């Protein structure tokens, strides 16, 4: 596995999510700096590390795939070692349910691995696991499948996107100059968004791939559904607000335009931590993974410093891969980078 240190920004996702078994129900992971927003590892990446431990735990039972997962993030994660403790809630023939707890601070080099007087519960999860490749049962088409919302966005000229960063319909969303150091997690991805207006009002459609060239596997889905371009808010915004953001130079002196653009410039000073995240896997990706996925993101309400997200993930054939729902907050970036109380010393 990765070393006990925080690790650099160049690690591959598959390397940065390795889980080492310490005993029958305890695993060690290493949260890598390259997957951080500010000082905090991305919540989806951290969740993927936990699910890697769960997959290893249930692999001998032939249930390596996550079917559903509910994550809560009561405390802020840090880079470096963490302990994942697994409780078998119910071990079934087709589906098993686990309770996962990720601990940091005061970690020990031998059993019991954590010091409960110092260590902190950082992330909690209830998860269900199965084998998606052998799962079978009744299927039927739904009315949703014939609605406009179910239509797959136009398939990109993927080679043009990789070579030139754009095609006729899509263009890469690039971080503004100076943002990369703060948003290392976003540099792990290439996000391609509509070149013009959102395909649907208040909806972000995008094609994504890993910047490293790695294929996206089943184990990456928790990270997929929690990774968004820096300008996502401009797509989720109401059409009238988006019009102000994109107003012509002739309107640059308008008070409304100036006010909206001033607030938009404050985006770099904001942090959007996830409070709760739910995931449901709809189908199994190929074992070797895929290069491209289509992701659709929408929000019902952004109000008083909190917001919801609904995420739909599909493959290039339009097959539904995963669904996810989030509750998140909008906080000052100082809440991300400020010092935490309590000891975080680890001996692992």
From Swiss-Prot:
The keyword Hydrolase applies. Keywords: Hydrolase. GO terms for molecular function: hydrolase activity. InterPro entries: ACOT8-like_C, Acyl-CoA_hotdog, HotDog_dom_sf, Sec_Metab_Biosynth-Assoc, TesB_ACOT8-like_N. It comes from the Eukaryota. It holds the Pfam family 4HBT_3. Signal peptide: none annotated. Pathway: Secondary metabolite biosynthesis. Its EC number is 3.1.2.-. Thioesterase-like protein; part of the gene cluster that mediates the biosynthesis of wortmanamides A and B, reduced long-chain polyketides amidated with a specific omega-amino acid, 5-aminopentanoic acid (5PA). The PKS modules of TwmB are involved in the synthesis of the polyketide backbone, whereas the non-canonical C domain of TwmB is a bonafide condensation domain that specifically selects 5PA and catalyzes amidation to release polyketide chain. This is Thioesterase-like protein TwmA. It comes from Talaromyces wortmannii (Penicillium wortmannii). The lineage of its organism: Eukaryota, Fungi, Dikarya, Ascomycota, Pezizomycotina.
């Amino acid at each position: 596995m990765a070393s006990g240190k925080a690790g650099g920004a160049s690690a591959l996702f598959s390397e940065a999510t390795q889980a080492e078994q310490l005993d029958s129900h305890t695993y060690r992971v290493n949260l890598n700096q390259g997957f951080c927003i500010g000082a905090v590892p991305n919540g989806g990446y951290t969740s993927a590390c936990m699910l890697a431990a769960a997959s290893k735990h249930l692999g001998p039972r032939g249930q390596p795939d996550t079917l559903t997962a509910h994550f809560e993030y009561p405390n802020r994660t840090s880079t470096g070692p963490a302990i994942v403790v697994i409780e078998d809630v119910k071990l079934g023939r087709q589906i098993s349910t686990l309770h996962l707890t990720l601990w940091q601070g005061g970690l020990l080099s031998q059993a019991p691995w954590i010091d409960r007087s110092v260590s902190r519960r950082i992330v909690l999860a209830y998860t269900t696991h199965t084998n998606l490749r052998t799962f079978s049962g009744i299927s039927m088409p739904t009315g949703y499948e014939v609605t406009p919302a179910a239509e797959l966005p136009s398939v990109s000229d993927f080679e043009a996107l990789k070579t030139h960063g754009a095609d006729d319909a899509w263009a890469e969303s690039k971080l503004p100059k100076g943002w990369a150091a703060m948003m290392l997690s976003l540099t792990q991805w290439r996000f391609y968004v509509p070149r013009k207006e959102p395909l649907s009002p208040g909806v972000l459609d995008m094609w994504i791939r890993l910047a490293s060239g790695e294929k996206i596997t089943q184990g990456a889905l928790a990270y997929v559904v929690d990774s968004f371009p820096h300008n996502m808010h401009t797509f989720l915004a109401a059409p009238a607000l988006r019009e102000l953001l994109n107003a012509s130079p002739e309107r640059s002196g308008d008070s409304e335009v100036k006010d909206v653009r001033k607030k938009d410039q404050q985006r770099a000073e904001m942090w959007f931590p996830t409070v709760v995240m739910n995931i449901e896997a709809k189908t199994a990706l190929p074992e070797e993974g895929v290069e491209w996925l289509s992701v659709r993101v929408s929000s019902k309400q952004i109000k008083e410093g909190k917001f919801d997200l609904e995420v739909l993930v599909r493959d290039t054939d339009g097959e539904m891969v995963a669904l996810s729902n989030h509750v998140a907050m909008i906080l000052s970036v100082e809440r991300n980078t400020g010092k935490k109380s309590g000891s975080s010393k680890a001996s692992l």
